[in-house]
């Protein structure tokens, strides 16, 4: 994995808005409706190539496929794993809303958030296994193809964390969370290894880490939530066993939605568990109004030797285009605490979380935000290394992922 050795590197967090025609294909596929499979595969490959080219053009250093061939960052597993053929008819769980008038105004049933916009939600009814590993191989091949002839610094592919699958997909088959998690870990390990073996950095997506508290375990003591969280991360480490930490980055966020977030778990209360994950880099939401202050916890929490922080420096749900000077300030705050070589700049989260959602941030605005992030990283680099810091460039030398 690259470090910011002579300037602040930039990346993003995986999902990008899908072109409208591809979005329609993904929605049909997700719902089990007829679609042209060969046209879909060709369009995904083309879209990935376009997305990679655009990432390089705006100056992003560590690029990805944008998850353009997936219905979502979690539920894509239903097309690939056995044991997920049933449909979950229940609404998305959640506590009674703390802002009931607001909840009513946006048509959320009191006590439960509907699954609208999440696509088809599967239900686990049998032992996990692979039924369609070729889709993993397709994702790898599409990114490999898109990178041909493109000069880039690094590349990554996202995959879902074992705990996030449990967060989204309940089971009528497994009799305990432990059995579910460890069985799934043994299965997902194959995907994790394939990404790393292809030469890419593996990004493991785990918004369940904080979200399980206020979506599933809001009515238990905080200590009990931490026990559940520790089990999920233990199972994830089981899946990551044997994979070099320097090939893994771990993404944590509080739900990629423009919502009050008034009861989000503070990072300070879970950061010790987050740092137990066998990854070199930790991608953490840090730009939005609820979590922008949390840079300060790193004054008291020591980032372990050799680790990297990938803080969010632009908001992924707001159409405000951050000023490059603000981005630079955020980067410098982190760099002066954990070391400039240990910081890579990124958005808070992805910009195309679910294919069933219209993009929360229009692609035109997203690319403008990315340009501000790149410009901010250049300003921060000059402040941290001096005016001779290497400038980010779309034609910079390609190094190993």
Regions found by a protein language model. Name each.
Residues 1-401:
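Domain-level signal for soluble alpha/beta catalytic cores
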């Amino acid at each position: 994995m690259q470090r910011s050795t002579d300037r602040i590197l930039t990346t993003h967090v995986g999902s990008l808005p899908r072109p409208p025609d591809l979005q329609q294909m993904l929605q049909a596929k997700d719902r089990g409706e007829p679609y042209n499979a060969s046209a879909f595969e060709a369009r995904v490959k083309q879209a990935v190539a376009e997305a990679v080219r655009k990432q390089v053009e705006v100056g992003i250093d560590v690029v990805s496929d944008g998850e353009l061939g997936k219905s979502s960052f979690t539920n894509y597993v239903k097309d690939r794993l056995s044991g997920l053929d049933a449909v979950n008819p229940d609404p998305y769980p959640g506590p009674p809303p703390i802002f009931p008038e607001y909840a009513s105004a946006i048509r959320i049933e009191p006590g439960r958030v509907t699954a609208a916009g999440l696509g088809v939600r599967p239900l686990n009814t049998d032992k996990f296994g692979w039924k369609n590993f070729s889709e993993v191989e397709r994702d790898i091949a599409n990114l490999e193809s898109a990178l041909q002839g493109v000069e880039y610094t690094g590349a990554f592919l996202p995959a879902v964390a074992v705990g996030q699958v449990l967060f989204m997909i309940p089971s009528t088959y497994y009799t305990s969370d432990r059995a579910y998690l460890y069985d799934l870990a043994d299965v997902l390990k194959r995907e994790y290894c394939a990404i790393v073996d292809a030469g890419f950095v593996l990004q493991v997506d785990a918004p369940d880490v904080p979200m399980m508290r206020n979506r599933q375990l809001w009515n238990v003591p905080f200590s009990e939530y931490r026990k559940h969280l520790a089990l999920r991360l233990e199972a994830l480490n089981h899946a990551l066993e044997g994979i070099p930490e320097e090939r893994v980055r771990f993404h944590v966020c509080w739900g990629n939605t423009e919502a009050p977030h008034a009861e989000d778990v503070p990072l300070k209360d879970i950061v010790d568990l987050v740092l137990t994950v066998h990854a070199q880099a930790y991608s953490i939401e840090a730009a939005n109004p609820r979590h922008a202050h949390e840079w300060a916890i790193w004054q008291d929490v020591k980032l372990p030797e050799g680790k990297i922080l990938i803080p969010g420096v632009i908001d992924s749900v707001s159409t405000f285009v951050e000023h490059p000077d603000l981005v630079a300030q955020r980067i410098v705050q982190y760099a002066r605490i954990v070391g400039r070589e240990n910081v890579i700049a990124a958005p808070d989260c992805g910009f195309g979380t679910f294919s069933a959602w219209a993009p929360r941030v229009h692609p035109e605005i997203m690319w403008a935000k990315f340009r501000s992030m790149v410009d901010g990283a250049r300003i921060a680099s000059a402040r941290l290394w001096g005016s001779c810091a290497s400038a980010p460039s779309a034609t910079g030398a390609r190094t190993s992922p």
